[in-house]
Protein backbone atom coordinates (compact mmCIF):
# COMPACT_ATOMS: atom_id res chain seq x y z
CA UNK A 1 0.00 0.00 0.00
CA UNK A 2 2.84 2.41 0.88
CA UNK A 3 4.62 1.70 -2.43
CA UNK A 4 1.38 2.23 -4.34
CA UNK A 5 0.79 5.55 -2.53
CA UNK A 6 4.26 6.85 -3.39
CA UNK A 7 3.81 5.80 -7.01
CA UNK A 8 0.52 7.69 -7.18
CA UNK A 9 2.22 10.73 -5.70
CA UNK A 10 4.97 10.62 -8.30
CA UNK A 11 2.42 10.12 -11.07
CA UNK A 12 0.52 13.18 -9.84
CA UNK A 13 3.75 15.19 -9.82
CA UNK A 14 4.59 14.18 -13.39
CA UNK A 15 1.08 15.01 -14.53
CA UNK A 16 1.25 18.46 -12.95
CA UNK A 17 4.66 19.20 -14.41
CA UNK A 18 3.53 18.19 -17.87
CA UNK A 19 0.31 20.17 -17.65
CA UNK A 20 2.07 23.36 -16.65
CA UNK A 21 5.24 23.11 -18.72
CA UNK A 22 4.11 25.77 -21.20
CA UNK A 23 2.49 28.21 -18.77
CA UNK A 24 5.22 29.11 -16.34
CA UNK A 25 6.17 32.73 -16.15
CA UNK A 26 8.85 33.70 -13.59
CA UNK A 27 9.86 34.62 -10.06
CA UNK A 28 11.95 37.09 -8.11
CA UNK A 29 15.57 35.93 -8.33
CA UNK A 30 16.95 38.74 -6.16
CA UNK A 31 16.08 39.05 -3.43
CA UNK A 32 15.22 35.39 -3.91
CA UNK A 33 11.56 34.41 -3.51
CA UNK A 34 10.76 31.76 -0.93
CA UNK A 35 9.67 29.09 -3.40
CA UNK A 36 12.66 29.64 -5.68
CA UNK A 37 15.08 29.35 -2.77
CA UNK A 38 13.50 26.04 -1.73
CA UNK A 39 13.55 24.77 -5.32
CA UNK A 40 17.20 25.68 -5.87
CA UNK A 41 18.27 23.63 -2.85
CA UNK A 42 17.17 20.54 -4.82
CA UNK A 43 16.80 18.39 -1.71
CA UNK A 44 13.04 17.79 -1.68
CA UNK A 45 12.49 14.79 -3.97
CA UNK A 46 13.50 12.12 -1.45
CA UNK A 47 12.63 10.99 1.19
CA UNK A 48 8.98 11.41 0.26
CA UNK A 49 8.08 12.93 3.63
CA UNK A 50 10.46 15.87 3.12
CA UNK A 51 12.68 14.94 6.06
CA UNK A 52 15.79 15.41 3.91
CA UNK A 53 15.11 19.10 3.25
CA UNK A 54 17.87 21.04 4.99
CA UNK A 55 16.28 24.47 5.43
CA UNK A 56 13.77 24.23 8.30
CA UNK A 57 11.34 26.69 6.69
CA UNK A 58 11.35 24.86 3.35
CA UNK A 59 10.93 21.57 5.20
CA UNK A 60 7.97 22.94 7.18
CA UNK A 61 6.43 24.26 3.95
CA UNK A 62 6.76 20.89 2.27
CA UNK A 63 5.37 18.95 5.21
CA UNK A 64 2.45 21.37 5.62
CA UNK A 65 1.15 20.44 2.17
CA UNK A 66 2.30 16.81 2.33
CA UNK A 67 0.30 16.11 5.48
CA UNK A 68 -2.71 18.17 4.38
CA UNK A 69 -3.14 15.91 1.35
CA UNK A 70 -2.76 12.54 3.09
CA UNK A 71 1.01 12.28 2.68
CA UNK A 72 0.93 12.99 -1.06
CA UNK A 73 4.41 13.71 -2.38
CA UNK A 74 3.21 15.13 -5.69
CA UNK A 75 1.08 17.74 -3.96
CA UNK A 76 3.99 18.76 -1.72
CA UNK A 77 6.67 19.05 -4.41
CA UNK A 78 4.44 21.06 -6.75
CA UNK A 79 4.91 24.26 -4.73
CA UNK A 80 8.67 24.05 -5.38
CA UNK A 81 8.63 22.71 -8.94
CA UNK A 82 6.18 25.43 -9.95
CA UNK A 83 8.40 28.16 -8.53
CA UNK A 84 7.60 30.37 -11.53
CA UNK A 85 3.83 29.99 -11.45
CA UNK A 86 2.68 31.71 -8.28
CA UNK A 87 -0.23 33.27 -10.11
CA UNK A 88 -3.86 34.26 -9.75
CA UNK A 89 -6.37 35.37 -12.39
CA UNK A 90 -8.31 38.45 -11.25
CA UNK A 91 -10.45 39.94 -14.02
CA UNK A 92 -11.00 43.19 -12.11
CA UNK A 93 -7.31 43.54 -11.28
CA UNK A 94 -7.40 47.34 -11.04
CA UNK A 95 -9.78 47.05 -8.08
CA UNK A 96 -7.60 46.48 -5.02
CA UNK A 97 -10.55 45.07 -3.08
CA UNK A 98 -10.95 42.40 -5.77
CA UNK A 99 -7.26 41.56 -5.45
CA UNK A 100 -7.56 41.20 -1.68
CA UNK A 101 -10.63 38.99 -2.06
CA UNK A 102 -8.86 36.67 -4.51
CA UNK A 103 -5.69 36.57 -2.40
CA UNK A 104 -6.95 36.75 1.19
CA UNK A 105 -4.93 37.52 4.29
CA UNK A 106 -2.58 34.72 5.37
CA UNK A 107 -2.38 33.45 1.76
CA UNK A 108 -0.26 36.18 0.18
CA UNK A 109 2.94 34.18 -0.25
CA UNK A 110 1.06 31.35 -1.99
CA UNK A 111 -0.82 33.82 -4.23
CA UNK A 112 -4.03 32.45 -2.77
CA UNK A 113 -3.39 28.95 -4.11
CA UNK A 114 -4.39 26.38 -1.50
CA UNK A 115 -6.55 23.81 -3.31
CA UNK A 116 -5.72 20.22 -4.33
CA UNK A 117 -3.74 20.19 -7.54
CA UNK A 118 -2.44 23.70 -6.95
CA UNK A 119 -1.61 23.97 -3.27
CA UNK A 120 1.29 26.30 -2.53
CA UNK A 121 0.21 27.14 1.02
CA UNK A 122 3.50 25.96 2.48
CA UNK A 123 4.93 29.35 1.53
CA UNK A 124 2.54 30.96 4.02
CA UNK A 125 3.81 28.96 7.01
CA UNK A 126 5.35 31.26 9.66
CA UNK A 127 9.00 30.46 10.40
CA UNK A 128 12.12 32.21 11.71
CA UNK A 129 14.14 30.20 9.18
CA UNK A 130 13.08 31.58 5.82
CA UNK A 131 16.29 32.48 3.97
CA UNK A 132 16.76 36.27 4.12
CA UNK A 133 18.80 37.89 1.35
CA UNK A 134 20.98 40.78 2.48
CA UNK A 135 19.91 43.88 0.55
CA UNK A 136 22.42 46.73 0.47
CA UNK A 137 20.91 50.10 -0.40
CA UNK A 138 22.79 52.22 -2.91
CA UNK A 139 23.60 55.92 -2.53
CA UNK A 140 20.02 56.73 -3.54
CA UNK A 141 18.57 54.47 -0.82
CA UNK A 142 17.39 52.04 -3.50
CA UNK A 143 17.80 48.33 -4.19
CA UNK A 144 17.83 46.53 -7.55
CA UNK A 145 15.07 43.92 -7.86
CA UNK A 146 15.67 41.18 -10.44
CA UNK A 147 12.75 39.11 -11.71
CA UNK A 148 13.65 36.08 -13.81
CA UNK A 149 11.07 35.79 -16.60
CA UNK A 150 10.60 32.34 -18.08
CA UNK A 151 7.81 33.81 -20.19
CA UNK A 152 7.62 37.60 -20.71
CA UNK A 153 4.28 39.41 -20.58
CA UNK A 154 3.63 42.88 -21.91
CA UNK A 155 1.89 45.18 -21.34
CA UNK A 156 2.03 44.84 -17.59
CA UNK A 157 2.68 46.74 -14.39
CA UNK A 158 4.44 46.09 -11.09
CA UNK A 159 3.62 46.96 -7.50
CA UNK A 160 6.24 46.38 -4.80
CA UNK A 161 5.40 46.22 -1.10
CA UNK A 162 7.46 45.99 2.07
CA UNK A 163 6.34 44.63 5.40
CA UNK A 164 6.00 47.06 8.29
CA UNK A 165 8.47 46.89 11.23
CA UNK A 166 5.73 45.39 13.41
CA UNK A 167 5.40 42.28 11.24
CA UNK A 168 7.27 39.13 12.32
CA UNK A 169 7.32 36.30 9.73
CA UNK A 170 8.31 33.86 12.46
CA UNK A 171 4.99 34.34 14.24
CA UNK A 172 2.30 34.99 11.63
CA UNK A 173 1.42 34.59 7.98
CA UNK A 174 1.49 37.80 5.95
CA UNK A 175 -1.62 39.99 5.62
CA UNK A 176 -2.32 43.02 3.43
CA UNK A 177 -2.38 45.22 6.49
CA UNK A 178 1.21 44.18 7.22
CA UNK A 179 2.37 45.81 3.98
CA UNK A 180 3.11 49.28 2.67
CA UNK A 181 3.65 50.12 -0.99
CA UNK A 182 7.21 51.19 -1.85
CA UNK A 183 7.23 51.12 -5.64
CA UNK A 184 5.11 51.04 -8.79
CA UNK A 185 6.40 50.51 -12.33
CA UNK A 186 4.76 50.34 -15.76
CA UNK A 187 5.91 48.26 -18.75
CA UNK A 188 9.40 47.45 -17.51
CA UNK A 189 11.64 46.40 -20.41
CA UNK A 190 12.82 42.79 -20.52
CA UNK A 191 16.63 42.58 -20.78
CA UNK A 192 18.46 39.28 -21.03
CA UNK A 193 15.56 37.31 -19.60
CA UNK A 194 15.09 39.64 -16.60
CA UNK A 195 12.88 42.48 -15.52
CA UNK A 196 14.89 44.82 -13.27
CA UNK A 197 13.68 47.72 -11.13
CA UNK A 198 15.30 50.09 -8.66
CA UNK A 199 13.06 50.15 -5.60
CA UNK A 200 13.34 53.15 -3.26
CA UNK A 201 13.63 51.84 0.31
CA UNK A 202 14.10 55.30 1.85
CA UNK A 203 15.02 54.93 5.53
CA UNK A 204 13.99 51.26 5.81
CA UNK A 205 16.44 48.92 7.55
CA UNK A 206 16.44 45.44 9.06
CA UNK A 207 14.50 42.27 8.40
CA UNK A 208 11.41 42.64 6.22
CA UNK A 209 9.35 40.75 3.66
CA UNK A 210 9.38 42.17 0.14
CA UNK A 211 6.13 41.41 -1.68
CA UNK A 212 6.18 41.65 -5.47
CA UNK A 213 3.10 41.83 -7.68
CA UNK A 214 3.52 41.55 -11.46
CA UNK A 215 0.20 42.19 -13.16
CA UNK A 216 -0.58 41.51 -16.81
CA UNK A 217 -2.90 43.89 -18.62
CA UNK A 218 -5.12 41.26 -20.22
CA UNK A 219 -8.76 40.10 -20.02
CA UNK A 220 -7.95 37.17 -17.72
CA UNK A 221 -6.14 39.47 -15.30
CA UNK A 222 -3.28 37.09 -14.64
CA UNK A 223 -0.92 38.33 -11.95
CA UNK A 224 2.12 36.88 -10.18
CA UNK A 225 2.88 37.27 -6.48
CA UNK A 226 6.15 36.51 -4.63
CA UNK A 227 7.42 36.79 -1.07
CA UNK A 228 11.12 37.51 -0.57
CA UNK A 229 12.59 37.63 2.92
CA UNK A 230 15.28 40.30 3.22
CA UNK A 231 17.63 42.05 5.60
CA UNK A 232 18.16 45.68 4.56
CA UNK A 233 21.55 47.20 5.34
CA UNK A 234 22.87 50.68 4.69
CA UNK A 235 25.94 49.78 2.63
CA UNK A 236 27.20 47.05 0.32
CA UNK A 237 27.44 43.64 1.96
CA UNK A 238 27.65 40.06 0.84
CA UNK A 239 24.26 38.41 0.58
Regions found by a protein language model. Name each.
Residues 161-195:
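Exoplasmic/lumenal beta-rich domain surfaces
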Residues 154-156, 206-208, 224:
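Short loop/turn segments at connectors of secondary-structure elements within structured domains
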Residues 16-18:
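N-terminal signal peptide c-region/cleavage motif recognized by signal peptidases
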Residues 22-153, 157-158, 165-168:
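N-terminal "mature-chain" segments and other terminal, solvent-exposed stretches
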Residues 163, 204-219:
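Internal, hydrophobic beta-strand segments that form the core of beta-sheet-rich folds
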Residues 222-238:
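Short beta-strand elements
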Amino acid sequence: MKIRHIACGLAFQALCLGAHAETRHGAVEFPVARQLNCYQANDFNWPADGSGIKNPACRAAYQEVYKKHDNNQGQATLQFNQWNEYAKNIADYNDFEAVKKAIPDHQLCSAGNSVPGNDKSGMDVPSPDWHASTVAKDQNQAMRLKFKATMPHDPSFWVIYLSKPSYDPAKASLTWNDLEEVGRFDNVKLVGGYYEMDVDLKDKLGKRVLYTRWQRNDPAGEGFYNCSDINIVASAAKK
